[in-house]
Amino acid sequence: MENTNRIVLSCPKDSYVSLQHIDKIYDNGVQAVFDFNLDIKKHEFIVFVGPSGCGKSTTLRMLAGLENITSGHLFIDGEYVNDVTPKDRNIAMVFQSYALYPHMSVYDNLAYSLKINKIPTKILLKEDKAKIASIEGELNYVYKQFRKINKEKDELNKLSNQKENSIRDLESIKDQKKAEKLQKEIAKLDKKLVNINEVDDEYEHLNKKVDEFSNLLQEAKENAHYEMHIDEAHCNELEKAIEFARSNGNEVHAKELEVALNKAQTTEVPVTKLKHLSKNEINLRVHEAARILQIEEYLDRKPKALSGGQRQRVALGRAIVRHAKVFLMDEPLSNLDAKLRVQMRSEIVRLHNDLNATTIYVTHDQTEAMTMATRIVIMKLGHIQQIGTPSEIYRNPANLFVAGFIGSPAMNFFNADYKDGILTFEDKTKIKLPDAVINGKFIPSKVILGVRPEDIHPGDGEHAREFPESIIELKVKVAELLGSEYFIHSDFNGKNLIAKIEANKPIAVDEKIKVCFNLRKIHLFDIETEKCIF
């Protein structure tokens, strides 16, 4: 992979993934990403969100190594990876399409990448290697029995459902001969189901055994000892970085790198080698992923026998078995229906937490961003607009674009003139802003008022008493009743205003109502720069 920009910076100490001044320019001269800077801590769930063409997927593909970085620097777990091939970056990617092999079972789909690729592996000392191999052998035997009983349990569940359907059919059959025939079939099913309780008991027993040996294996790995060495390759990279920093006159940074070099030259780290996993190791990883994703009963099925949600779990499982440093997800839920998307959102977050993973997730759906992210990166036309927690983004948008993009229904915007604490709208409506809201800030004469639908309240309530100067009269154009609340659509200064109001009493179309703004939660934007004033 080509990159004209060599190492200039090092990865910040508390950063697990660091993108520094990343640009992407295609051969036709189109620039997709501009000066992208982001430091991601270990175990964070970062969401890139924005409209189509904003550069979010391009940035993700540069992280994966599927797109060349035109300029800038990328670090993963302290390693400079601009020139590292995708397969050697130790990342796992989940795409919008499930990308499953239709002719393979779920088990083989999960195991395939482990069979064909060499995996970065720490080299255990002989004694610990023998101990861990022994536990892995025991656990593999239990998994083999567990898979067998799972298959038997699945078959018995099908028979049980068949019996229930037959009993239901029997109640509606009036023909005596047909009824007798169905009763015989039910009797045959009863014989086949005679040991269903024993199978359930064995399933629970093996389930406990899996937990027992899994805990033993985890404990053994946590206490294991590995072959250690001084990482000469890392030391060489640091020496190059020091030389480059000095050649650019950055003595402060050079000294910081010298401290890091001294530590690297005196601190042994585990020896890591690329090797093919054994059959036992692959089997353990597959069953571990299937157990986490609750798809153990589907291991022998082909993808065509699975629902959309189950296929997406298998796609996630293919990433999990890699034991990757970073999970990259490119709109993985966009092929699912609305109900399943909600379910899978929570499952992905649970999975992220269970694995203590570091996840970077791309979506155009602001609901996914708000409900899943530790931090959100909002993008527009290749530029970062704002980085922050969901709460920060929602409450303190950086500019007009962010304010309008986040929130459903979207924030209402109205042009206004400002003078001496008073907003004057195009229809000459005036709203006086409290001094506490202005708080000494400089406000230009031309502004845009932003107010969220949920911050518009009835004109006879508590907020109206607090902010009587914000009361306005509206004529209802549309009244959408959503059970406990209304979405009221009205015309205000030639624009559609949406208010989210509790459904305490009926509201009819063409009715005139009074509402007020919660002036503590409004936003003002500079009409020229579109930046948020407050």
Kindly give the residue locations of the regions a language model identified.
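Conserved coupling/switch loops of ABC nucleotide-binding domains, chiefly the family-specific signature
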Residues: 68-73, 107, 122-128, 381, ...
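Helix-to-loop junction immediately C-terminal to a conserved catalytic motif
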Residues: 64
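The feature captures the beta-strand-to-loop junction immediately N-terminal to the Walker
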Residues: 49-51
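Conserved ABC transporter NBD signature motif
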Residues: 72-80, 127, 196
